[in-house]
A protein has these predicted regions:
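Short beta-strand immediately N-terminal to the catalytic nucleophile in serine-hydrolase-like folds
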Residues: 14-19, 48, 110
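Conserved acidic catalytic loop of the alpha/beta-hydrolase fold
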Residues: 1-13
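Gly/Ala-rich beta-loop-alpha elbow adjacent to hydrolase catalytic centers
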Residues: 19-23, 27
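Hydrolase active-site cap/lid region
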Residues: 33-88
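Core-facing hydrophobic residues within beta-strands of well-ordered domains
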Residues: 12, 41-42, 133-134
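Serine-hydrolase catalytic core
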Residues: 84-162
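Active-site signature of alpha/beta-hydrolase-fold catalytic machinery across serine-
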Residues: 29-33, 125
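Residue-level signal for short, function-critical loop segments
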Residues: 21, 51, 113
Length: 163
């Protein structure tokens, strides 16, 4: 993000961050801990079927008996996170909202009603913590993937950006 003004040749006055699935998780973090030029320019964030908890991802993705490897997986994740970000105190248990971050900017959420990838748990966690400053839409015709665009999603997004 620091390089955006250099790449564009100007500093954007209005700026939104879009995040889908795990990208939504990163968007929540970036917008909750903004710094640099985008702190003043950020108008809001757009989350599409976002992940909201690393523990929920790991618990859902470890099949059958692999659940017994959870402590090892948590150890590896924590070690690698601390290697990349030694300055941030994020552990496995607090790698979820609200600990991960709570954006203070407006939030548009477009959630697939039948989210075959993340299920409903991430959405429920988001709704529990971010309802106050969020415009939340559950779309029955939209799958989890961002490869498919549906008319309802487009209309919601365009209307929200025009406000």
């Amino acid at each position: 993000l620091e390089e955006v003004p250099n790449v564009l040749g100007f500093t954007p006055k209005k700026f939104w961050i879009y995040g889908h699935s795990l990208g939504g998780f990163l968007t929540i973090r970036l917008s909750s801990h903004s710094s640099g030029w985008w702190e003043k320019s950020m108008q809001g964030i757009i989350l599409e079927s976002p992940a909201t908890s690393f523990p929920l991802i790991i618990e859902k993705k470890l099949p059958g008996r692999a659940v017994m490897a959870s402590p090892w997986v948590r150890h590896i994740l924590r070690r690698e996170y601390q290697r990349i970000h030694p300055d941030l105190n994020v552990g496995y248990a607090n790698a979820q909202i609200p600990y991960w971050g709570s954006p203070k900017v407006p939030i548009l959420v477009m959630q697939a009603e039948d989210d075959e990838t993340l299920g409903i748990d991430h959405y429920n966690l988001l709704k529990e913590h971010f309802s106050e400053n969020s415009d939340i839409h559950v779309l029955s015709e939209m799958p989890h993937t961002s490869k498919v665009d549906v008319k309802e999603r487009r209309e919601i997004l365009e209307k929200w950006l025009e406000r």
